[in-house]
C-alpha cells in the first residue's frame, strides 16, 4: 500500500518542529546527541518540503543528513589531538572563499530551479539553501561564524518563505531558532574565551583565529 504523505503531514510538521528545537538547543550546549536528533529532524523536514514544493530545501535536508553524520564524527574526533573538537573561528581566507562560493552557487542554483522546476521562489529558495549548507558546514567544524549565518542568512529569510508557502508552524519555528542561535553565539564565544584562558595557544589548530 502506498503511503500518502498528505495524510501524515499534520503529524510530520509538529514532530519536525519539536526535534528541530531540541537539535538547536542541544547544539548550543555542544552536546553530541544533537547530531542524531538532528538527522531525524531533517528527515521529517525533507518529507514536509517535498509536499510543499520546496525542492531545493528538500535536497538540502538530504545534504543535512550526510553532514549530520560527518559532524557527529568530527565533533568527537576532530580536535587537535584527535579528541573533542573545540570552538574556533574561521580564517579570513576561509571567510572570503565561502562568501564568493555563496554568491556563485546561489546564482547557479536559482537559475536551475527557475528553469527546471515549478518553484515560485527559485532565487530566495536557492539563497537560503546555499546559506544553510554553508552554515551547516561551519557548524560541523564548530566555527563561531555558523551562528550569525544561521540567523541572518537562513532563519530570517525563511520566515517570509514559509509564510508564503503556508507553513505557519515552520515559520514560527524560525523565531525560536533565532533566539536559540543568539544564545548559541554567546555561549560558544564564552567557551572560546574559557578555553584560551586554560590551554596554551599551541593547542589551537594552525590557521584558526581565537576570539577573546
Where are these regions (language model features)?
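Transmembrane helix boundary and interhelical junction motifs in multipass membrane proteins
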Residues: 34, 38, 146-149
